[in-house]
Amino acid sequence: MIHYIELSAGDVLRNGFRRLTARLSGAKRLLSSRERTEEILAELREDQPPFSPELTGFDNVVSTRTVASAQCVTFTPRWVEIKKHVIYFPGGLVRQPTREQLLFADDIAAKARCPVTLLAYPLAPTYSYADAYECAARLYAELAGQLGAENVLLMGDAGGGSIALAVCGYFARAGLPKPGGVIALSPVCDMSLGTEINEDGDPLLSAPGLRAILKSWCGFRFPTDGAVNPMTAEADAIPDTLLLCSDAELLFADICRFAVREGLRRRTALHAYRGLLHGFAFDGRLDAAKDARERIVDRIRK
């Protein structure tokens, strides 16, 4: 069942301005063709910028370390209230985590009163899902051993949301216990992208470019393979899931199809905000973003 959430009057105005700004920015045109996206991927293969974040201006204690080949940034509240830990997979797949994703992780840690670790996984096109899953499994096994698997939750946005969902099958095949839950914001639920795509209604995402990125991420796997695709992944390996998205984004139809998958529909809660842009939860000025973050914190503390 989908729970639709109407926007406040203030959000209607703010969202209208954000949609206009997005259209004028030309961001969608940048990845509007497969050929242009493949050119960008070729450039990234030659020169991928390193992950070197500015780790100041956060509410929590910030620490960094390397797990396998991934850099991890952990936000730990000065007063930890619950014995849980969240592994956060930032969206991007081909780009390093952004400042807003770091601030988001910091905010969730502060509100949930538990550590949140942002995993800066290896990126396509130089690497693929397999390298990222190996890093995720190493970190997850460590935390599950310390806290118990039921106290470790996976969280991700966009492409990172697809990792949070599909990596559960990898954990199961590696003999690791099921995580305590998954929280996914506007995840890519079908790596092949379904046929019911709201291309015109989304001023940010473009299907041709996104397909090229996802193909690169999947490496030698077909995008329909359950090893990389949440839509065909083993349902029993995926724990209770909270999905948050907009009903106006390109990915919405696939998110809905995933939420009613056999074996998942009774364990999946989907909240869809009316008319917002992809990535709305990062804009702290939106009432909808505040609401989404409250739902995330409630799920973590459950």
Residue ranges of predicted features:
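A glycine/proline-hinged amphipathic helix-loop "lid/cap" segment
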Residues: 1-78
